[in-house]
Amino acid sequence: MLTTLCVLASLLGCQHLPIEGFTDVQSQIVHQARIQGVPPHIALAVAEQESRFKPTAVSKGNYGIMQVQLGTARRFGFTGTAKELLDPNTNIKYGIAVLAHCYKKYAFDLMSLGCYNGAITFNSTYIREVLNKSKKYQLMLK
């Protein structure tokens, strides 16, 4: 039902519906995750792990909340500048698009998170930390 409301809100031009107990950024992440078929608790955990939800985070060519690389965003249709990846809505949209691609490719959390992290050899610490963070969001979204 909530997924239907998110899709309907998107079609009507609304960015997202606020979710009680979540910040605006977190609500947007849940909204995009549901639209793109990614488990929302995993998307929230990735954003927390990558930037602690900080829209202005920049590190080694990674930008914004989801720490998206410009070249990666371009592969998913982004035509803007690196600075534009710092816009929370833009960053979340493309970050979750990458995560959705990884889920379609690997279909389960461990491999999908390794894919998102850009690993040729999977970073088990990153995966473990994201999965641990995801547990609290899974409980909050029930």
Residue map of PLM features:
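Catalytic glycan-binding domains that act on GlcNAc-containing polysaccharides
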Residues: 16-142
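Bacterial Sec-dependent signal peptides at the C-terminal "C-region" and cleavage site
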Residues: 3-23
